[in-house]
Amino acid sequence: MSSIAQSIRVKVLFFGRLKEVAGGAEEFVELAPGSRIEELFACFVARQPELARYRRSLVASRNQEFAAWSTPLHPGDEIAFLPPVSGG
């Protein structure tokens, strides 16, 4: 048995103002198995603390379906963080 921890790789997408704050629209991230969307977002907040101010108004999606922040991640998932939409 290997002592090296396994990881999962997910694709992360940012939209709207979040692209600027996060430093890009798309990124691949390696996480520990069992990680949840909220933990993924926390990784980005650790790098870009300004993202924390958007957390309460964001919606997350997993594989193009709305998802709760407590949703577990799986290898190959595509996670998108979407700011509120406004329009006229």
Name the predicted role of every residue range.
Residues 1-87:
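Ubiquitin-like/PB1-type beta-grasp interaction modules and other compact soluble beta-rich domains
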